[in-house]
Amino acid sequence: MCNESIEVIPRLRYLLTFTESKEYCCTECKSHFKKLSKVRCPNCYKEIQGNECVDCQIWKKKGYTPNHIAIFRYEGFMKEYFSQYKFMGDYYLRKIFQEDIADALNPLLKKGYTLVPVPLSEERFAERGFNQVEGLLEGLPYQNIFGKKDIEKQSSKTRKERLNQENPFFIKQNVELSRKIVIVDDIYTTGSTIYKMVQLLQKPDVEEVVTFSLAR
């Protein structure tokens, strides 16, 4: 992110498997990304003292308990990362967290879960040129089962508006749903985006839905 050259130090896993070590971010920049602590909401990984966060309490009143996993805090350097990657279109930055994401999701893949990225509307995809979530999942198998209607950007909405927004997502025609699904997003804020997708998966064939985001 700082445009400095990267010194690659081989890691044990690459030495043992004779594979190439890939580093896409310098050590200095990577040190600014902070992982979520163990003191957090058990449902959505929000860092709080005590038990459930307010958002999860709201979801429970609607009959939904989040089952979410996240890795990093959405603050400071991570916000700058998404500004460059998502909004300024620096597609190369999708590679920075590939190893972190693979480490988090591979155990679920081994248990038979199918990764499902949050989609963009056709209008947003044409504007951005890529789906940032699919970029983060590069190298991992995933299935596109959802489509999305064009609506106002989430970032322009208030917290209350996000929670009460009508469902813009739909399941594509002739899609075979897996029994166990992981919905993957880039950032988790109130959980409204993921909740609307989970609603659509309330079907007999779907046994379990887990959700994941890079940042929380």
Describe the function of each predicted region:
Residues 1-216:
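Glycine-rich phosphate/pyrophosphate-handling loop used in enzymes and phosphotransfer proteins
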